[in-house]
Regions:
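Conserved core of the PLP fold type I
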Residues: 33-213, 217, 223-250, 260, ...
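Conserved core segment of the aminotransferase class I/II
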Residues: 63, 124-127, 133, 173, ...
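Conserved C-terminal alpha-helix-loop-beta "cap" of PLP-dependent enzymes
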Residues: 285-290, 298, 358-405, 413-418
Length: 438
């Protein structure tokens, strides 16, 4: 190391300077300084500092629905009744699995996860009883999903366990809908690959979900961090899986749908707020998610912080935050792309990042990314996220051999440049030692 600094590309959260302290203080004061608010006694809203309703404040859900409609422009509009509030995306995934699957009982047969996958998602599925029941689904070379493989595996599992009618549990009021399969994915600016799935892929995936009674859980947490659109306007996001599902749903045959958008404000405001939301096709599924035992006991898990978020949205402050973040991350992503091309081996496989936090970098044949990452951290003070972190439990595909995930959320441009220079230097040492082309 030339100096004592550590450059950490593993971190997937904003730089401290990007955390909107002043905006949050301003919104909190606007929310709490009045002694009374018109909705304080409304059971669908409640005072910000008391227990909230199970689904979360109505006015906040209405503000989020407006934001969704402005950014996604769905064919069939999102309404407040389609949304419930959560304690963030991690809580949201846990709650979805708890409320819609029965892995322990064997009814929900299999969980499918896109691979490479978010590196902390495995434990949540293991906690929900999916140990030994998790299948990796690759992305294709063009950044889409291997839907043929997914369809083949669904057909195999259905042949092993003949299909039954969709299960609802009549003892609960309202009845609880349970799915035979579940799939986890990040369709837009995926973590870790950075891929965005086309509308055709999304449509075909919803069709498969309906055919095999599979719930699609999409982490829609990066959708609004687009770099390839003017940053002075709200981003125009691709239709989410929920919007594709809703646009073609026959409610006489299915009033639940097969999709849940699991979203968070951690990436576009601040992770410490621990606040997110979920959206489903109709009000039935989010109603089920909101009426688990914990919410019935304590109300929405982010009553105060969700109202701070609602204030940020309704005052227009969130739009300004998005504008700033997208500009900052775009600049960093451009520096990263140039540095990859300048410092890494010529045959490195890397696609320029056009949104979100992450991108995926694969070194040429013969390079060992795991060994390179160890040397980088120990001798050069650079921390990279080696591909081995992004495997699906019990269905590994070998991402640790040559691939790493890179992040622009935490490091400043000069740190990105220097980190990639050191990365390239170690790759050069590696190539020289093994007689590899550089």
């Amino acid at each position: 190391m030339a100096d004592g600094s550590q450059i950490n590309f593993f971190k997937g959260h904003p730089s401290v300077r990007l955390l909107p302290r002043e905006s949050i203080i301003k919104s909190t004061k606007e929310l709490l300084e009045p002694e009374h608010r018109g909705y304080d006694q409304n059971p669908e809203d409640c005072h910000p500092l008391t227990y909230g309703s199970e689904q979360g404040s109505l006015w906040v859900r209405s503000a989020i629905a407006t934001l969704i409609n402005d950014c996604y422009r769905p064919e069939k509009a999102t309404r407040a009744e389609h949304v419930n509030l959560t304690g963030g995306a991690s809580y949201g995934i846990m709650n979805i699995l708890m409320q819609t699957t029965l892995a322990h009982a064997g009814y929900t047969r299999r969980a499918f996860l896109v691979s490479p996958t978010y590196f902390l998602i495995n434990q949540i599925f293991l906690d929900a009883g999916f140990g030994g029941r998790m299948t990796a689904v690759r992305e294709t070379q063009d950044g889409q999903l291997d839907l043929e493989y997914l369809a083949e595996k669904l057909s195999e599992f259905d042949a092993e366990h003949p299909s039954t009618e969709a299960l609802t549990e009549p003892r609960r009021t309202p009845p609880k809908r349970t799915y035979r399969y579940v799939m986890y994915l990040i369709p837009t600016y995926s973590n870790p690959s950075g891929s965005t799935y086309s509308l055709e892929t999304r449509t075909r995936l919803v069709e498969l979900a309906r055919r095999y009674d599979m719930l699609l859980i999409s982490d829609d947490i990066y959708d609004l961090l687009a770099y390839d659109q003017p940053s002075d306007q709200l981003p125009r996001a691709l239709p989410s899986l929920v919007h594709v599902d809703r646009a073609t749903l026959n409610e006489e045959q299915d009033s639940w749908g097969h999709t849940v958008a699991n979203a968070s404000f951690s990436k576009i405001v601040a992770p410490g707020l621990r606040c997110g939301y979920q959206e489903s096709v109709t009000s039935r599924l989010v109603g089920q998610l909101a009426n688990g035992g914990a919410n019935v006991s304590g109300g929405s898990p982010a009553q105060l912080n969700s109202m701070i978020i609602g204030t940020l949205i309704s005052t227009g402050e969130l739009a300004h935050l998005l504008q700033s973040l997208r500009s900052v991350y775009q600049d960093r992503a451009e520096v990263l792309h140039r540095a990859v091309r300048e410092y890494l081996p010529a045959a490195t496989d890397y696609k320029a990042q056009n949104g979100g936090y992450f991108s995926w970098c694969t070194l040429p044949e013969g390079y060992n990314s795991e060994a390179i990452c160890r040397t980088l951290q120990h001798d050069y003070g650079v921390v990279l996220a080696n591909g081995s972190h992004f495997e699906v439990s019990d269905d590994e595909l070998g991402w640790g051999r040559r691939s790493v995930r890179l992040s622009v959320s935490f490091l400043e441009p000069a740190e990105i440049e220097e980190g990639m220079r050191r990365f390239g230097a170690v790759c050069q040492e590696h190539a020289t030692a093994l007689g590899l082309p550089f």
